[in-house]
């Protein structure tokens, strides 16, 4: 994860952002953010300006160039499965088309992606694929059919989309996630997997990290652990 690029992204998204807000966004200490800001100033990615008594950071052209390789090109939304855990709701409706607070989950995700400028969206379909066809006209998305949806898992669906993914920065999402806040960005400065922390025992899929914060192992069940959660 390029943390200097993350600093630049924070400033791009919120020009009046404080270092304290940046620390919260990046889940690191204020001191670490202060050090990263100094690095970015020294590299010429950002500059500091004053407005009266207040100081603020601005993103320079060199900082924008730093962000370019991290531009998100598109999103693949996995919507091929039957959704057995949602039975009987999914007998006639695919799980991604179920409503939460009066809004279909997959439509909310599409809108959130559009909000950050991501419009190249492919939906991988299988079960009741015809139910998703209205999204083509409504949101200008593409549908990719996986005929093996009933006998193979999500990895097989992702493999079907390999041409769409190859050489590109792409979100891989599940159709049945509902996020109150928009967690997507125009730029992603490294690969990541969404997770939540659980105190005490859990039977979820728990993640193990190495010293660089990269996922090194996944196990079912754990204690006081980060587990797979969300897109």
Q: Would you name each region that the model predicts?
A:
Residues 1-17, 24-25:
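Short amphipathic alpha-helical interface segments
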Residues 1-3, 18, 51-69:
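Short, cationic-aromatic polyanion-contact patches
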Residues 31:
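Key DNA-contact positions within bacterial/archaeal DNA-binding proteins
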Residues 41-51:
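A short, conserved structural fragment
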Residues 62-129:
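N-terminal glycine-rich phosphate-binding loop and ensuing alpha1 helix
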Residues 130-211:
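Conserved beta-loop-beta/alpha segment of the NTase-like Rossmann-fold superfamily
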Residues 212-231:
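Catalytic-core segments of class I nucleotidyltransferases/pyrophosphorylases
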